[in-house]
């Protein structure tokens, strides 16, 4: 099969990181096609959302009582989705997501099994199944398994070498497949500046826009990109850790830096409150909430921790007019992107040639369960990124700036991924 005929699709995930992995895969296939694929047409929406950007509830096998109940839901979604398609997609893509349950491998494999069964029952021909950012797992229904290096251990490498059938399906990459580019940063930076100009006299936004304008004109800058907790207890992302980060931010401010904090869906609401309240008192530190804000009763349940609920809901709703300032704030020049060790986003900025740091100290991560986090930090530092504590010391004592770091560019695996998809699809016939 030639690349131009390939059409991929996916079930839209609720997790932003997973969505970005899938968008990267779509972009890779589109670029090999020589065309820009519209993601609005490639995502199956699992929860009645109007856009893949608005999905709140993921389709997860372990969340159903039985396989039959799961397939009934999936088949209904696929029937509705494919009823409007002129071309039946041949490639189904999903992501190994350890943040949504303790059985991410099983969830991905069963989803791929169900998709293959749907194609067989509906006489749609063969479908190739792909799982991104996976750990080692004995998949039965996945045709292409992307395993980033940081998700492997020595013992898992040995197991993979010994499993010839599984090994044939594996594509190992340095870093993750993602949708982050420097051009996107530039475009988002232009959008951010246009919004700042539009709302500079807005009563709700004037204060934060003034602080962002101050940040923009600083000669050196730092943007903290926060990760957060997961469903289990293996990552402890708490106030103690964030107090340490904020203290480091104050040291950098004292050395002439402008600082921005942006949270994410996994950032605890208590941490969000702490940073917002602290930043209000410092003209050189900006905090912008990027979590969804509670709207309905279900959003206040403990299980809805990815949605912000707390004392600052009204303030954050007013600030929504500004939009998500990340990654636009990375585009002002001489800026360091600081990622917490629990996040894979460090791969994104490192591959876009943005000076990147990884914050490890003070963040507890169970090494037996989430060895991938430490592995990624060790793979990136010091070749492609810098340890954040080292940077703080160098910035404060030696006047080192982000532009002085000059890290090596982390290669983006998009093309090799797309070429592998074409090759495997041809092998499947």
For the regions a language model picked out, list residue spans one by one.
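Leloir-type glycosyltransferase catalytic cores
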Residues: 194-204, 374-429
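Catalytic donor nucleotide-activated moiety binding site of glycosyltransferases and closely related
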Residues: 254-318
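Active-site and donor-binding regions of nucleotide-sugar-utilizing enzymes
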Residues: 9-172, 178-180, 300
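A nucleotide-sugar donor-handling region in carbohydrate enzymes
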Residues: 140-238
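Short acidic-hydrophobic, aromatic-tinged amphipathic segments that line or gate anion-handling sites
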Residues: 171-174, 285-295, 306-314, 321, ...
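Conserved catalytic-core segment of nucleotide-activated headgroup transferases in glycan assembly
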Residues: 222-225, 229-270
């Amino acid at each position: 099969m030639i690349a131009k005929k390939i059409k991929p699709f996916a079930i839209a995930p609720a997790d932003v990181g997973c969505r970005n992995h899938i968008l990267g895969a779509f972009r890779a296939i589109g670029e090999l096609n020589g065309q820009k694929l519209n993601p609005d047409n490639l995502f199956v929406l699992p929860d009645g959302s109007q856009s893949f950007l608005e999905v709140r509830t993921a389709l997860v096998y372990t969340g159903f009582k039985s396989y039959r109940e799961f397939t009934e839901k999936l088949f209904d979604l696929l029937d509705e989705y494919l009823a409007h398609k002129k071309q039946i997609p041949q490639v189904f893509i999903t992501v190994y997501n350890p943040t949504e349950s303790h059985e991410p491998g099983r969830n991905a494999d069963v989803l791929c099994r169900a998709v293959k069964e749907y194609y067989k029952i509906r006489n749609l021909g063969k479908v190739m199944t792909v799982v991104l950012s996976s750990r080692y797992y004995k998949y039965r229904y996945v045709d292409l398994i992307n395993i980033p290096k940081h998700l492997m251990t020595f013992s898992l490498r040995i197991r993979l070498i010994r499993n010839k059938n599984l090994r044939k399906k594996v594509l190992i990459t340095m870093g993750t497949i993602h949708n982050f580019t420097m051009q996107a940063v530039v475009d988002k930076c232009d959008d951010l500046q246009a919004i700042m100009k539009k709302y500079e006299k807005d009563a709700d936004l004037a204060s934060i826009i003034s602080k962002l304008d101050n940040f923009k004109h600083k000669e050196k800058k730092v943007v903290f990109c926060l990760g957060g907790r997961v469903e289990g207890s293996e990552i402890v992302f708490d106030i103690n850790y964030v107090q340490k980060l904020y203290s480091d931010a104050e040291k950098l401010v004292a050395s002439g830096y402008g600082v921005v904090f942006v949270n994410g869906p996994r950032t605890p609401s208590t941490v969000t409150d702490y940073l917002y309240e602290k930043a209000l008192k410092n003209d050189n530190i900006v905090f912008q909430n990027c979590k969804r804000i509670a709207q309905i009763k279900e959003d206040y349940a403990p299980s809805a921790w990815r949605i912000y609920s707390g004392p600052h809901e009204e303030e954050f709703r007013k600030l929504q007019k500004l939009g998500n300032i990340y990654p636009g704030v990375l585009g002002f020049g001489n800026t360091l992107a600081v990622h917490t060790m629990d996040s894979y986003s460090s791969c994104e900025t490192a591959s876009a040639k943005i000076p990147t740091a990884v914050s490890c100290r003070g963040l507890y991560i169970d090494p037996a369960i989430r060895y991938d986090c430490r592995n990624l930090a060790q793979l990136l530092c010091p070749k492609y990124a810098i340890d954040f504590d080292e940077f703080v010391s160098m910035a404060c004592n030696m006047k080192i700036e982000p532009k002085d770091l000059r890290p090596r560019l982390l290669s983006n695996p998009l093309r090799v991924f797309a070429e592998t998809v074409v090759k495997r699809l041809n092998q499947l016939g």
